[in-house]
């Protein structure tokens, strides 16, 4: 409840001057053909399809981790993200855990990490605040000694490592798995980013050795020249950020590796193990199925990584008997012996890994969403609530699409780099903040999640940011030209800026933000409603498009409509892990046996906690339904909406002040009906249409429970009803009507009139029973759906008979007059003029 000046808001008719709506139809659906890949990929990759096979195997293989359990997929297993709920906390900037800790189990009540008394007001009382981050657990802290080879030269899945005491990630002296200081970005659609990681430190120009691209001029691989000699070879591949990104985590002492492991070590290990030897692979896997070991015969693939590499890569990068030492020096020819001698294939493993994983991830494109159907011309692909949320998303009132632009809904993608958008053209752009103007890298924005000094984000990339390269005169190292219309002056605004992520499949990829601070999409919408958490403290750092959104403030139905739109960005193939999102089995460490106060020992090294393992079963091309497995769930499996809002003495106990709000088209007008559950002085009815929230506003007396609106508005309109009592704003409710592009489009019917004779009688029950049990035609399914639950079942004819003969309840609206269906569902009417 909030105090308001009723007289300032009571206007019979108000047309708002708003910026023009940005229509989503300004671009088309996402096309697989637009997937960016390096132009010179064929100089290294011999067979793209074989490279995809190799990349998928490497991405999912747990043997890549020094612990024999941590794969790339471990942090990207669920819709491309990491939704584990135990041992995921990192202390963040302060270096000390405050509310959470090692092995803590996350619950919905832990979020958001900055809790305010009013989630729509950034300056309201702070209930709690923490620098903590929800990251991804990697491996325990340990030094790498060597890979562990047996006498036959086969590698153990667990490396020879020595545990290191870890005062940060431990409980009573027992080490727990370390956790990253940022939340894991989701992998699906990541091929489209210009630079990768939250700060973009994985560069678009791949150097074959590390993530830094042109930032490492000494990066070299080895190659066989035309004369058969082994020579150093620089690698330069544009549009290859995923190759740069993929070679970071495997050597990270937090994520996957013992400290000190090198790429030739990992190459030797993987060339000495059976691919996916610890994991079942479905015989119907869309990529690996033909190589999968038959059920009952073991696990893994029937081939070797050596064979897979030879089929995928050009021979000049592996076909040699040269032997190299730990430092990459050519020390002879023949067969490498022991863990410290390496073949050319093993010496070039960073190149092989990076390109193979990039090729695999380039196939993970989710372009079969209902949003894509809408963009392709299907106006009914979205529900009315989703369409209204989309209109708000693309409106000048919220400014969401300024940064979340294009078919990927991200300004950090190749398709948006040189596109004229409201956040600039080209890699280096003018950046307006809430205080002054400056410059920064396009697609990276400070949105006020935390104080800028806690994590400087893009600025941490140093002299390799695009802005720094531009000022250093290294314009040839930019991913595109700087546009002459951009004013590049003032302060550097890369401080605290992070990559704008795609919003596709976002309902599955929580927790949200670079620090994992929001658990639900509603919390994200409320974050933007209040204009970020620290905009008022760091106005000179936070982008000008992040500021309070008044029309969303205390208007939960509008916020929920935006959440509904975001859910329409989910590709059902991702939800059900259908091709190309199928995968091998994966054993997932989800914290340790015990609590945040005490853990059981039992890790690989002494003084390490015993892992609590979750088994993700292997899935084939047909997805989870093939193995009778439920769909992928979001983080904590938390509903995106808010719980029921008890509003105290003014709200009638636990009931909302108004309930059962419905709206429908009746004759040439829109009718709203609702129930009032408490004393109400007045109502404000707002009409949202075309992306303008409150295009018209009306005052209604508190003793009314109905409202009529006589203006036709095309497409979808939201009707927001906000009750007031003694100057206090209570919880609002909303309903939606989609009237089409022209008047008279909606079908009108009388609820319960199954046979369309204009009245309710026993014939309606008989006709409905025949339809349910014999398949007889039901001319208007909506009319037959007595309780408007979106389904036809035996309860509907029973309710008809109960109403006719036993004084049972009347049907849902529309009744007793003909009108349109108040609720959007999958039922339909085969006749358009039923009531005429």
Which positions does each model-derived feature cover?
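Short strand-edge motifs at loop-to-beta-strand transitions and within beta-strands
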Residues: 705-707
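Pro/Thr/Ser/Gly-rich low-complexity, intrinsically disordered linker/stalk tracts
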Residues: 652-679, 728-746
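Cellulosome-associated attachment modules in secreted, modular CAZymes
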Residues: 19, 652-654, 735, 739-836
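Short beta-strand segments within Ig-like beta-sandwich modules, predominantly Fibronectin type-III
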Residues: 697-703
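Beta-strand-rich modules
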Residues: 709-729
């Amino acid at each position: 409840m909030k105090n308001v000046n009723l007289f300032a808001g009571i206007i019979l008719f108000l047309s708002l001057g708003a910026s023009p709506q940005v229509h989503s139809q300004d671009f088309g659906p996402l096309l697989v053909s637009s997937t960016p890949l390096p132009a010179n990929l064929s100089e290294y990759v011999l067979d793209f399809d074989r490279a995809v096979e190799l990349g998928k195997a490497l991405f999912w293989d747990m043997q890549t981790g020094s612990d024999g359990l941590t794969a790339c997929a471990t942090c990207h297993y669920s819709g491309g993200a990491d939704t584990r709920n135990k041992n995921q906390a990192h202390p963040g900037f302060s270096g000390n855990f405050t509310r959470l800790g090692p092995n803590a189990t996350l619950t919905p009540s832990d979020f958001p990490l900055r809790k305010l008394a009013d989630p729509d007001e950034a300056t309201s009382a702070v209930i709690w605040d923490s620098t903590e981050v929800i990251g991804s657990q990697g491996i325990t802290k340990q030094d790498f000694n060597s890979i562990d080879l047996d006498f036959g030269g086969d590698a153990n899945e667990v490396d020879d490592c020595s545990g290191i005491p870890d005062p940060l990630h431990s409980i009573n002296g027992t080490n727990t798995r370390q956790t990253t200081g940022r939340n894991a970005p989701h992998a699906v659609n990541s091929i489209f980013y210009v630079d990768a990681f939250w700060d973009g430190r994985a560069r678009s120009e791949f150097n074959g050795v590390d993530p830094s691209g042109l930032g490492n001029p000494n990066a070299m691989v080895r190659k066989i020249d035309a004369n058969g000699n082994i020579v150093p070879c620089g690698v330069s591949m544009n549009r290859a950020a995923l190759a740069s990104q993929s070679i970071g985590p495997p050597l990270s002492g937090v994520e996957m590796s013992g400290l000190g492991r090198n790429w030739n070590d990992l190459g030797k290990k993987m060339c000495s193990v059976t691919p996916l030897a610890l994991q079942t692979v479905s015989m119907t896997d869309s990529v690996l199925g033909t190589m999968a070991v038959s059920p009952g015969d073991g696990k893994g693939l029937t081939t070797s990584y050596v064979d897979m590499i030879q089929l995928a890569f050009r021979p000049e990068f592996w076909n040699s008997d040269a032997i190299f030492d730990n430092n990459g020096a050519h020390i002879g020819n023949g067969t490498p012996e022991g863990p410290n001698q390496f073949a050319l294939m093993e010496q070039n493993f960073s190149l092989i890994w990076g390109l193979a994983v990039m090729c695999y991830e380039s196939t993970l494109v989710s372009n079969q969403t209902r949003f894509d159907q809408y963009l392709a011309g299907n106006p009914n692909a979205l529900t009315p609530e989703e369409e209204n949320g989309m209109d708000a998303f693309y409106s000048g009132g919220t400014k969401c699409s300024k940064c979340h632009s294009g078919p990927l809904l991200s300004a950090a993608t190749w398709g948006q780099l040189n596109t004229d958008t409201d956040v600039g053209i080209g890699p280096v752009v003018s950046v307006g903040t809430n205080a002054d103007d400056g410059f920064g890298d396009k697609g990276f924005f400070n949105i006020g999640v935390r104080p800028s000094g806690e994590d400087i984000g893009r600025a941490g990339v140093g002299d390799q940011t695009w802005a720094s390269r531009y000022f250093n005169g290294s314009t040839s190292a930019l991913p595109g030209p700087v546009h002459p219309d951009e004013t590049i002056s003032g302060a550097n605004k890369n401080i605290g800026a992070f990559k704008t992520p795609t919003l596709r499949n976002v309902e599955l990829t929580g927790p949200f933000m670079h620090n994992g601070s929001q658990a639900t999409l509603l919390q994200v919408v409320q974050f933007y409603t209040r204009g970020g958490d620290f905009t008022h403290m760091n106005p000179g750092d936070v982008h000008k498009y992040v500021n309070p959104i008044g029309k969303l403030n205390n208007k939960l139905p509008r916020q929920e409509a935006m959440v509904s739109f975001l859910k329409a960005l989910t590709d059902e193939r991702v939800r059900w892990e259908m091709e190309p999102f199928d995968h091998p089995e994966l054993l997932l460490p989800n914290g340790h046996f015990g609590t945040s106060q005490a853990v059981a020992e039992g890790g690989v090294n002494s003084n390490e906690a015993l892992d609590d393992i979750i088994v993700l079963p292997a899935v084939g091309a047909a997805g989870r339904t093939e193995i009778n497995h439920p769909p992928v769930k979001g983080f904590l499996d938390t509903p995106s909406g808010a719980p029921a809002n008890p509003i105290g003495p003014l709200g009638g106990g636990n009931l909302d002040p108004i309930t059962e709000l419905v709206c429908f088209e009746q004759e040439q007008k829109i009718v709203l009906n609702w129930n009032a559950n408490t004393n109400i002085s007045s109502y404000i009815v707002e009409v949202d249409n075309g992306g303008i929230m409150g295009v018209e506003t009306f005052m209604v007396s508190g003793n009314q429970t109905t409202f009529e609106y006589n203006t036709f508005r095309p497409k979808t309109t939201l009707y927001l009803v906000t009750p007031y009592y003694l100057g206090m704003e209570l919880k609002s409710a909303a309903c939606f009507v989609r009237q089409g592009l022209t008047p008279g489009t909606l079908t009108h019917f009388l609820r319960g009139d199954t046979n369309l004779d204009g009245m309710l009688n026993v014939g309606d029950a008989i006709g409905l029973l025949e339809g349910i049990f014999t398949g007889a035609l039901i001319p208007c399914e909506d009319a037959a759906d007595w309780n408007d639950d979106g389904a036809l079942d035996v309860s509907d004819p029973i309710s008809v008979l109960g109403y006719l003969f036993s004084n049972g309840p009347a049907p849902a609206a529309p009744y007793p007059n003909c009108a349109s269906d108040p609720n959007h569902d999958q039922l339909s009417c085969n006749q358009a003029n039923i009531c005429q």
